[in-house]
Amino acid sequence: MLKLLSEIGPVIAFFAGFFYGGGIQNATLYMLITAIICVTICYFVDKKVSKLSIISVSVLLVSGIITLISGNSIYIKIKPTILYVIFGIIFLMSGIRKNPFIKYALESIVRLKEESWITLSYRAAAFFFFMAVVNEIVWRNFSDETWVKFKVFGVIPITFIFILLQLPLLLKNKLPDSKI
C-alpha cells in the first residue's frame, strides 16, 4: 500500500497544485516535494527504494527543477514521455536478453514460469511505448488543464486496465507457491 501511495501521491499533489494552487509551476513544486517525501518515507520503512522509483524521481527532479527555473512547462510535460520510453526500453531489452526485469519487480507478489515473465516484459514494453505516444499527443494538442486531467483521470485508469488485462496470463502461468 505504501508503494502505491508513493507512486500516486505525487500525481495527486500535482493535480491539486494545478487546480487549487495556481497552475503548472505550483503543481510542479508540490509534486517535487511530495515525491521526495514519499521516497524518503519508503526508504525509512522498507530500508530500500526500487530502481524504477529512483529513475522516476531522478527524471522528475531534473524536469521539475528545469520547469521551475525556466518557467517553461514543456519540461514537466515531457517527463512522462521520457520515463515511459526509459521503462519501455528496460522491459524490452530485458525480455530480449531473457532476463526479465519485471520479474524482479513483481516476484515478491507472483511467481511465474520463466517464459511468462518474458511475455509480460514485452507487454509492459509495448504498454510504456504506447503511453509515451499518448502523452505526446495529449500535451502537444490540448490545453494544460486537459493534460493535467489526463494524467489523473486517463493514465491511472489506463494503467489499471492494462494490469487487469494481464491477469489471465498471470493466473494461467503462476507457480503453485505464488501469492495470487
UniProtKB/Swiss-Prot annotation:
Gene Ontology CC annotations of this record: plasma membrane
Keyword field: Cell inner membrane, Cell membrane, Membrane, Transmembrane, Transmembrane helix
Transmembrane segments: 25-45, 54-74, 76-96, 118-138, 150-170
InterPro entries named in the record: YciB
UniProt KW Protease keyword: no
Record flagged with keyword Ion transport: no
A Pfam match: IspA
Cellular localization per UniProt: Cell inner membrane
Membrane-protein topology: Multi-pass membrane protein
Principal place of residence: membrane
PANTHER family on file: INNER MEMBRANE-SPANNING PROTEIN YCIB, INTRACELLULAR SEPTATION PROTEIN A-RELATED
Family membership noted in the UniProt record: Belongs to the YciB family.
Role played: Plays a role in cell envelope biogenesis, maintenance of cell envelope integrity and membrane homeostasis.
Name of the protein in its database record: Inner membrane-spanning protein YciB
Organism annotation: Rickettsia canadensis (strain McKiel)
